UniProtKB/Swiss-Prot annotation:
Molecular function per GO: mRNA binding; structural constituent of ribosome
Cellular component annotations (GO), alphabetically ordered: cytosolic large ribosomal subunit
Start and end residues of each stretch annotated as Disordered: 94-155
Similarity remark: Belongs to the eukaryotic ribosomal protein eL24 family.
Protein name: Large ribosomal subunit protein eL24
One GO term (biological process): cytoplasmic translation
Keyword presence, Ribosomal protein: yes
Entry keyword set: Ribonucleoprotein, Ribosomal protein
Higher taxonomy: Eukaryota, Fungi, Dikarya, Ascomycota, Saccharomycotina
InterPro entries per record: L24e/L24_sf, Ribosomal_eL24, Ribosomal_eL24-rel_N, Ribosomal_eL24_CS
Length: 155
């Protein structure tokens, strides 16, 4: 025994029951009752009609006991070695006291400042040597003399 399903309401249609509606594009619609056929022809939305299967599915009626709550897995953080830092080194750095870490940071900053200062001084001395070797550069415009603006004769 083949049981069909109503195209509008989703109800079961047993053999010998219901009607068929064939649309112009040859799509077949089966209706269990004239009520569902009428509502279909009025272009009603079955999701908005309370007694249809689609309405019940859309508004989550009568399926609460079937669906079990999905369990979410909690992520666990794990320490891993990174390129350029082994796991032991990372653990050692983490275990340092904040005061010690601050002192190390200040020391590193000071060393970097000194290095930057030394680099700057070296570059400056090198630039001075080059300037002394070449002599002073004078552009053609400077050699000609500054442009003299003509004084206006009218008042």
């Amino acid at each position: 025994m083949k049981v069909e399903i109503d195209s509008f309401s989703g109800a079961k249609i047993y053999p010998g029951r219901g009607t068929l509606f064939v649309r112009g594009d040859s799509k077949i619609f089966r209706f269990q009752s004239s009520k569902s056929a009428s509502l279909f022809h009025q272009r009603k939305n079955p999701r908005r009609i309370a007694w249809t299967v689609l309405y019940r599915r859309h508004h989550k009626k009568g399926i609460t006991e079937e669906v079990a709550r999905k369990r979410t897995r909690k992520s666990v953080k794990a320490q891993r070695a990174v390129v350029g830092a082994s796991l032991e080194l990372i653990k050692e750095r983490r275990s340092l006291k904040p005061e010690v870490r601050k002192a190390q940071r200040d020391e590193k900053k000071k060393a970097d400042k000194e290095k930057k200062k030394a680099d700057k001084a070296a570059r400056k001395s090198e630039k001075a040597k080059l300037a002394a070797a070449q002599g002073s550069k004078v552009s053609k415009q400077q050699a000609k003399g500054a442009f003299q603006k003509v004084a206006a004769t009218s008042r």
